[in-house]
């Protein structure tokens, strides 16, 4: 197959999706909790939304679902006292997040490593992502605005690739590839993530991100009496979620909590939600009986990765 140039709009789409996976985490949360209300169907859609996964879920009989679920409950119960606390649920959900992120990265590594030599080169990454090797000259003027935006994102990817390549070899090892795909999971990538975010959002170069910079190019319509709902939501997030010291700007650490998905916070929120919904005797913890009584709810939550763990013996196997 001849690898020719791809349409600019399509070329832009892929890196934008990658960027949105990190910077747009708050949008997914809005879908999960519209107007602050939990959508149980979103839980199932999020990972069981693929029809093949739904089919596998349905194939399991009720007794087998229950057996595997009981095995998972025992593993979540780290102190073996017969109850699941908020902390135990939160720790389990965070472990689940990391497990699936690592599994996905390992699968991607095999796909990207075209010559199966145990390393992913920059050219191999480009071929897998864009069907062609892209080599932008940073200083060449481009007439096409979309192509210019794509070049900017592509060069960012290249910088992240080079940062992940700790040994400066010809390609990324599996561990380095994981650092490239999931920099939030690797300590040596933290500073790079912060600097990348500052370059993107810190327009005046003071080392902080103000509310105006946080909102990007938004300007209120002069004919409107108030900001649109999504702007009000983003302002609320800035003030209440990210600006911890209330100084009206985000320092590098506060910025990190914005641009990197906060798995700990998400996991804690889901743990509290489950206890609130399933704790029949109001003791702030869950017994096996309470969970089995609300089995459908538990299987549409992040505690079982929306039922996915029932099909992954890493979680329900006795030797985890």
Curated annotation (Swiss-Prot):
InterPro entries: EF-hand-dom_pair, EF_Hand_1_Ca_BS, EF_hand_dom. It comes from the Eukaryota. It comes from Mus musculus (Mouse). Disulfide bonds: none annotated. Its main location: endoplasmic reticulum. Ca(2+) 6 binds at residues 279, 281, 283, 285, 290. Not known. Binds calcium. This is Reticulocalbin-2. SMART domains: EFh. GO terms for molecular function: calcium ion binding. Residues 1-25 form the signal peptide. It is found in: Endoplasmic reticulum lumen.
């Amino acid at each position: 197959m001849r690898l020719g140039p791809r349409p600019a709009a399509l070329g832009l789409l892929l890196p934008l999706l990658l960027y949105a996976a990190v910077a747009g985490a708050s949008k997914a949360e809005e879908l999960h909790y519209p107007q602050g209300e939990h959508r149980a169907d979103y839980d199932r859609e999020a990972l069981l939304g693929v029809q093949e996964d739904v089919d596998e879920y349905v194939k399991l009989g009720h007794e087998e679902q229950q057996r595997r679920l009981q095995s998972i409950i025992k593993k979540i119960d780290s102190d073996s006292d017969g109850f699941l606390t908020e902390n135990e649920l939160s720790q389990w959900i965070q472990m689940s997040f990391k497990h699936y992120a690592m599994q996905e990265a390992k699968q991607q590594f095999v796909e990207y490593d075209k010559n199966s030599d145990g390393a992913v080169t920059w050219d191999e990454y480009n071929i897998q992502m864009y069907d062609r090797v892209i080599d932008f000259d940073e200083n060449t003027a481009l007439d096409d605005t979309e192509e210019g935006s794509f070049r900017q994102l592509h060069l960012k990817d290249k910088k992240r690739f080079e940062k992940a390549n700790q040994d400066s070899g010809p390609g990324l090892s599996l561990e380095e590839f994981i650092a490239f795909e999931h920099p939030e999971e690797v300590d040596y990538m933290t500073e790079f993530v912060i600097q990348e975010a500052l370059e993107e959002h810190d327009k005046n170069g003071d080392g902080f991100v103000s509310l105006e910079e946080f909102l990007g190019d938004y300007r209120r319509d002069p004919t409107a009496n108030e900001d649109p709902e999504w702007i009000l939501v983003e302002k609320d997030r800035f003030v209440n979620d990210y600006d911890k010291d209330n100084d009206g700007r985000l320092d590098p650490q506060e910025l990190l909590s914005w641009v990197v998905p906060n798995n700990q916070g998400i996991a804690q929120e889901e743990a509290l939600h489950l206890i609130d919904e399933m704790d029949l005797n109001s003791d702030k913890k869950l017994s096996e009986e309470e969970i089995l009584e609300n089995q459908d709810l538990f299987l549409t939550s992040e505690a079982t990765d929306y039922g996915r763990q029932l099909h992954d013996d890493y979680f329900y196997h006795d030797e985890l």
